[in-house]
Every structure is written in structure tokens, then in C-alpha cells.
Amino acid sequence: MPRYSKWIRVVLLVLMPLLLPLVAAGQGLLPSADGQECLYNVRIEMEKGGMTGVCMMLRDSTGLHGSVVNEFGVGLMSFSYTFGSDKVRLHSVFGKMDKWYIRRTLRRDLRRLLHAMGDGEATYRNDRRGIGYSFIPITEDETSR
């Protein structure tokens, strides 16, 4: 086995620079350039119910700023994510969800969801709390209708 590991390392070192641009292209679901906006269909599912809506995220030089609005136009939450400190800050949360323990869970889950979206995954599930998050990008075709 050790004899093959040298060859595997050599092959990986040769192919990695060639494959990295292909893997990185188009995988992230987050806005990639400063000033870019992205829209997402949002679904938050819990055992006793769920919420759906739309999220708009804007990227600037420090991080991401987002706001989630439900189907009736009521703001569920607005947040910001700072790249340097890798932290999510909740600016406002819907009244019935504005409890310290819910805010803490939302903050942690949004951070993990944003990491997953950067890796190309549109969903995140908090198995401990039984909460599922889904942020599906809205394409240009859907918004022009």
C-alpha cells in the first residue's frame, strides 16, 4: 500500500491545479462579487410547522447582508454575516421568534447554512432541534414573469 501512495500523491499534485477551476466554477450559491444581489426561495421546516418566503442577499466588501420576508410581506428576519470574524448578526427577528434561545439557534444555523451554500449545498438540517433550512436560488427566468 505505501508503494501506491507515492503515485497517488504525484497524480493528485499534477491534476489538482487543472481540476480546481472546474470544481470551483459555479459551485457556490452565495453572491460572489461586491454589490451583487441574489434571491432565494426560503423554506424553514420544524416539527410543528414551517415558514416559506423569499430571501434577498447582498454582498459588500465586509460580508453578506440578508433579509427574509414571508409570502405575505411580513419580515421574518434580517441578518448580516462578516467574512473576517465568521459571525452572523441578527438585526431583527419576527416578534414571536424574538426569544434569546431562538435567536441563538438561528444565528448558529444561519452560519452553518451560509457555509454550506458556499460549498454549493442549498439545504441545512439541524438534527438536534429538528429544523430544516432550504435556500433555493431564484433564476432570472422566474423573476421576469
Predicted regions and their residues:
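Intrinsically disordered, low-complexity segments enriched in small/polar residues
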Residues: 22-26, 33, 51, 61, ...
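Short, hydrophobic/aromatic-rich segments at coil-to-beta transitions
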Residues: 34-41, 61-67, 119-124
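Extended interaction regions within the primary functional domain
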Residues: 2-4, 19-25
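Bacterial N-terminal signal peptides that target proteins for export
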Residues: 2-12
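Mature, soluble, non-transmembrane domains
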Residues: 25-29, 41-47, 56, 74, ...
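Bacterial N-terminal signal peptides
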Residues: 10-21
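Structural recognition of beta-strand segments within beta-rich domains
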Residues: 46-61, 65-68, 73
